Amino acid sequence: MSRLHLHLISDSTGETLENIAKAAIAQFDDVEVVRHFWPMVRSESHLDRIMAEVRASPGMILFTLVNGELRSSLERRARMLDLPTVAALDAVTDALSRMLGQEAKARPGRQHVLDAAYFARVEAIQFTVAHDDGIGWENWEQADIILAGVSRTSKTPTSIYLANRGFKTANIPIVPESPPPSALFNLKRPMVVGLTTGLDRLVQVRRNRLLSLNQAPETSYVDDERVKAELAFARRMFADNGWPVIDVTRRSIEETAAAVIKLVEDRASA
């Protein structure tokens, strides 16, 4: 089976870009696509952070950026890495421009009707980006969802996916030597969901991560006994607090997010 890293970079919520990617990927069999989702990209500093991740997981870049300078910067950086870039809406926009006899207006997210739902998604994405990896725990009560789990259990990409569906999502790494803030155990509004995974898969994912960063592949971070202890510690915490748990071992980001959303909806209807 072929494996492809696909980086989706958008200056808006990225919903249009994601739908295009899904439709295109569905045309191919026996391909494992690892999607990296980057919404609300509107500055060079944000692009700097993204390109660091692209370097670590090189692959195809599919984008919708209407800012000319940002777009040129992305394309230039991709060429330096010898990576292909595809502007998802260019062909359609160019055809419409020729037919209508007018230039398209370069405005980020112009394809969206600026209604309450759209603004809610934007707000959710901004909240989620600002509350990644345990940051901003003082504001957790404002969240809809808190994802907890050991390192490399897909907390961040799942959070971003949920944010694109309008859920303010924070996430917190569970580390035995560094207990989470006590606020995590006293939340009223958010639903806290534990993410776990199989030992073998987690060790492999972590080892691949170290290799992509050119770091020593044999450390306690990938030691079987150490990782097993981390998973057990996290599971005990989830059980002690009555938090629902989702095993992400064989789930895509979309499937994990769908399971989280169902938990939220079930609680709301209870």
From Swiss-Prot:
Catalytic activity from the UniProt record: N(tele)-phospho-L-histidyl/L-threonyl-[pyruvate, phosphate dikinase] + ADP = N(tele)-phospho-L-histidyl/O-phospho-L-threonyl-[pyruvate, phosphate dikinase] + AMP + H(+); N(tele)-phospho-L-histidyl/O-phospho-L-threonyl-[pyruvate, phosphate dikinase] + phosphate + H(+) = N(tele)-phospho-L-histidyl/L-threonyl-[pyruvate, phosphate dikinase] + diphosphate
EC assignment: 2.7.11.32, 2.7.4.27
InterPro entries linked: Kinase-pyrophosphorylase (IPR005177), PPDK_reg (IPR026565)
A Pfam family the protein falls into: Kinase-PPPase
Gene Ontology terms for molecular function: ADP binding; ATP binding; phosphotransferase activity, phosphate group as acceptor; protein serine/threonine kinase activity
Chain sites annotated for binding ADP: 149-156
Annotated S-S bridges: none
Residues passing through the membrane, by range: none
Record's keyword terms, sorted: Kinase, Nucleotide-binding, Serine/threonine-protein kinase, Transferase
Family to which this protein belongs: Belongs to the pyruvate, phosphate/water dikinase regulatory protein family. PDRP subfamily.
HAMAP family, A to Z: PDRP
Job description of the protein: Bifunctional serine/threonine kinase and phosphorylase involved in the regulation of the pyruvate, phosphate dikinase (PPDK) by catalyzing its phosphorylation/dephosphorylation.
Protein name in UniProt: Putative pyruvate, phosphate dikinase regulatory protein
